[in-house]
Amino acid sequence: MATAAVIGLNTGKRLLSSSFYHSDVTEKFLSVNDHCSSQYHIASTKSGITAKKASNYSPSFPSSNRHTQSAKALKESVDVASTEKPWLPNGTDKELEEECYDDDDLISHSVEAILLLQKSMLEKSWNLSFEKAVSSEYPGKGTIRKKKIPVITCSGISARQRRIGAKKKTNMTHVKAVSDVSSGKQVRGYVKGVISEDVLSHVEVVRLSKKIKSGLRLDDHKSRLKDRLGCEPSDEQLAVSLKISRAELQAWLMECHLAREKLAMSNVRLVMSIAQRYDNLGAEMSDLVQGGLIGLLRGIEKFDSSKGFRISTYVYWWIRQGVSRALVDNSRTLRLPTHLHERLGLIRNAKLRLQEKGITPSIDRIAESLNMSQKKVRNATEAVSKVFSLDRDAFPSLNGLPGETHHSYIADTRLENNPWHGYDDLALKEEVSKLISATLGEREKEIIRLYYGLDKECLTWEDISKRIGLSRERVRQVGLVALEKLKHAARKRKMEAMILKN
């Protein structure tokens, strides 16, 4: 037999001699091979192997195609080897050669069984390796978990629609999370302290309210003690008047303070919700929140838990009052009274009602609908004029740098508002003062200063004569001569333009 046949049979020999199975076919195959090579006789035992046909063979391992290809390659190598002339050693007899050719038929019959046996052995070996791999992934378990095959079901909705829906849901969740975080930051920006997110029960509110009431009674007692003593009482004096120790007094004050803080912090979100309704009406959000917190503290002090009302229902109106007052005080550059703000609100609502009916909202119709005089309506509408600073930028700057202000587009015709005019007056006074000091004598200086009011006192010739002790005519003559001296000196110093102008 050819070398290729020997190689193929040797491969089958290795497979058959493995530790998986041992049968009489193995012994027979080995005896035949040894007989052909070393002149031993073939055993007459028949094979007892029963194997399935290749058509009925359906391996459960996923790589069954590779098994089939390996078996097919082995069979092809054996078929090619069977067509070639078998190899015999030198010096063999003719009988031995015929005996080897008779054994070829037996080998061809056993090849089919060998191939089927190889398939089953490879399947067992691969299944064993797979079991080892699975057992290593899931240690401590005696049984091997089978892989679950996903079952695809049709839901009636396309995959694209499911992806779009999942994306929208994710975006909505992200926006909600961002809004919660931003609202929390906004509240923390206006309020100092830890904001309570848990809703207090009515029993807890009643307990805290009683502590706050006891603190208010303590403040009243302290104010009465201050009136009797005439000064602010110390902690020792207050504790003695209450017949308690100083430590008990401090613990009492601390409990009242903590109760007020806890009850206020649990209602901060209510303040924010009310303040947001008055946003964009001219006042800053921080001012509205501060006004609402002042109203909240006032409502907590006034709350009576014995009447059975919820604290949020009671403090709502106090918070609203505080926010509205903050709006009145901070919404305009020029503050308007509270009653005027209320009147403006009534006028605004009356205008909306008239416009809905298709009526032009004039002053007389608004006054008639509100049962108010036309003068009050006119005064309120005239007070609504907006006030803005001329130092503001006329146009928004794109590069962030300050641009032209309203002063560049609005001219002021009044001379006293011109800054250069004041500078000119000051320079003229200094020049005239130097000219008088350098040109005139003492009497002439006094007469000129009193007559022209250079010392902020303007007198007549007669008043000057009474003060100096000269006649009126003599004072007038001295004054006129002094004025001529000043004109002559001014011409020399080239001050004619200033003298003629002024």
Curated annotation (Swiss-Prot):
Keyword Magnesium: no
Region of interest: Disordered: 57-92
Biased composition (Polar residues): 57-71
Tissue expression remark: Highly expressed in leaves, and to a lesser extent in roots. Expressed in old seedlings (8 days), cotyledons, hypocotyls, leaves, sepals and siliques.
DNA-binding region: 461-480
InterPro entries, A to Z: RNA_pol_sigma-70_dom, RNA_pol_sigma70, RNA_pol_sigma70_r2, RNA_pol_sigma70_r3, RNA_pol_sigma70_r4, RNA_pol_sigma_r2, RNA_pol_sigma_r3/r4-like, Sigma-70_RNA_pol_init_factors
Biological processes per GO annotation: cellular response to light stimulus; cellular response to redox state; DNA-templated transcription initiation; photosystem stoichiometry adjustment; regulation of DNA-templated transcription; regulation of RNA biosynthetic process
Disulfide bonds listed in the record: none
Primary subcellular site in the record, as a coarse category: plastid
Keyword flag GTP-binding: no
Phenotype of the disrupted gene, per the record: Lethal.
Subcellular location: Plastid, Chloroplast
Molecular-function annotations in GO: DNA binding; sigma factor activity
Induction cue: Induced by light, especially after dark adaptation. Induced by both red light (660 nm) and blue light (470 nm) in dark-adapted plants in a cryptochrome-dependent manner (i.e. requiring CRY1 and CRY2). Induced after three days of imbibition. Promoter specificity is modified by phosphorylation of Thr-170. Suppressed in response to infection with the necrotrophic bacterial pathogen Pseudomonas syringae.
GO cellular component: chloroplast
Transit sequence range: 1-23
NCBIfam families hit by this protein: sigma70-ECF
Function: Essential protein. Sigma factors are initiation factors that promote the attachment of plastid-encoded RNA polymerase (PEP) to specific initiation sites and are then released. Controls the transcription of the psaA gene and thus modulates photosystem stoichiometry. Thereby maintains a harmonious electron flow and photosynthetic efficiency.
Oligomeric and partner information: Interacts with SIB1 in chloroplast. Binds to CSK.
Similarity annotation: Belongs to the sigma-70 factor family.
Name of the protein: RNA polymerase sigma factor sigA
